[in-house]
Design a protein with these regions (language model features):
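Mid-core helix/loop region of P-loop NTP-binding domains shared across ATPases and GTPases
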Residues: 2-19, 26, 57, 74, ...
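Intrinsic disorder
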Residues: 34-38, 56, 68, 95, ...
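Pre-Walker A adenine-sensing motif
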Residues: 42-53
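N-terminal alpha-helical segment
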Residues: 44, 89, 142-145
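Walker A/P-loop nucleotide-binding motif
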Residues: 55-76, 97
């Protein structure tokens, strides 16, 4: 006496959902509205403002507890920069993945030239010169966000990276670069 039950559709094929937008759960989701960070975004915009007139931006450090929106704030800022300026080239570098001076400049090169530098036989000096010369020749200002900059602290790699970025104009007159460091507060 087992009356035949209606067969449920396979759960994986259901079109119904409780969520209006599943994309908000994706790790790379960037919200349309970024609430409660207006003061921090305004401070970052103030630092970037000189670059809009072709000057050097003011360097900044975003410091706060993990998961409070530091990286998202930078992505929102960079989104706005790319929408309103061709003079500024914003580059986000994840220092957990790119933790050497060469790796940081590799990412800059890739962003500027829209392809990676040759995979072998090219020195840091050559990559550095190409990036700095492009900044000078094309009248571009590079804004480099070093996310999780604390990963550059071992071996004092941070000294080499910052020195190369902030003193590029000495090697290549006219090169303009600014740095935004992003770091979680140390417990």
């Amino acid at each position: 006496m087992n009356p035949e039950r209606p067969k449920k559709p396979d759960m994986l094929l259901w079109e119904e959902t409780l969520f209006k937008d599943r994309d908000i759960f994706e790790l790379d989701h960037l919200p349309d509205q970024f609430l409660h960070r207006e003061r921090q975004l305004d401070s970052l915009k103030f630092c970037i403002r000189p670059a809009l007139q072709g000057g050097r931006p003011v360097n900044a450090l975003c410091l706060g507890p993990p998961g409070t929106g530091k990286t998202t704030a930078i992505f929102k800022l960079f989104e706005e920069i790319e929408a309103h300026s061709t003079r500024i080239v914003p580059v986000h570098v994840n220092c957990q993945m790119d933790s050497t001076r060469y790796a940081v400049f590799y990412q800059l090169y890739k962003k500027i030239f829209e392809h990676a530098p040759p995979s072998s036989g090219i020195s840091f000096k050559r990559v550095f010169e190409k990036v700095a010369q492009h900044s000078a020749d094309e009248d571009k200002v590079l804004i480099v966000a070093l996310d999780d900059i604390n990963y550059l602290f071992p071996e004092k790699e941070v000294d080499h990276v910052l020195y190369s970025l902030l003193r590029a104009h000495e090697t290549c007159p006219g090169a303009r670069m600014g740095v935004i460091g992003i770091m979680s507060e140390l417990a």
